[in-house]
A protein has these predicted regions:
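Active-site environment of non-heme Fe oxygenases that use a 2-His-1-carboxylate facial triad
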Residues: 1-21, 26-27, 34, 39, ...
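A short alpha->loop->secondary-structure connector
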Residues: 55-69
Length: 167
């Protein structure tokens, strides 16, 4: 990884080859898409890289897992989950920018990635559930509930609308 090689917005799958990691990343992708839906990866040497190099590696690997996209209307490519001391009771504050415990929720993506740079002194645990695995378990136990999953749901974008999106 070289911080002066590419800007994040210039990175593509082709411009960020993974000659030694490629097969492993493809196996992760298969696990995510057709297996358990969850893949824990450990051992990226983030302590040896600058923040720019970490971002480049994360974004580049992401291109091998899917198609990364902007995180918000400001077109930020990477969102940082940390406490910015924002008011938790403000309905427009994103909870990932506070020290609040975040309940299970759905992110608007097929694949979500998290990379820990600095473990929290307290808390900071992530819980994940594969929607595919959850669907299959629910289908086995309560198939009569499945039609409800295909009904429209309310979506709270916390005031972060990208032009052309419905609220």
């Amino acid at each position: 990884v070289s911080q002066d090689s590419l800007a994040l917005e210039e990175v593509t799958r082709d411009s960020f080859p993974l000659p030694t990691l490629g097969k492993k990343v493809e196996a992760w992708r298969q696990t995510i898409m057709t297996g358990t839906g969850v893949q824990v990866v450990k051992g990226l040497p983030v302590g040896q890289w600058s923040e720019a190099e970490i971002a480049l590696a994360y974004w580049g690997i992401g291109h091998h897992l899917g198609t990364p996209g902007a995180q918000n209307p400001d077109n930020e490519l990477l969102g940082h989950v940390k406490d910015y001391d924002e008011a938790r009771d403000d309905p427009f504050v994103r909870l990932y920018r506070t020290n609040s415990n975040i309940r299970y929720h759905c992110d608007a993506a097929d694949i979500v990635g998290l990379l820990c740079l600095k473990p929290a002194k307290t808390g900071g645990k992530s819980r994940v559930v594969s929607t595919g695995s959850l669907f299959n378990a629910l289908y086995q136990r309560h198939p009569e509930w499945i039609p409800r999953l295909f009904e429209p749901i309310k979506l709270d974008r916390r005031g972060e609308l990208i032009e052309g999106q419905k609220p």
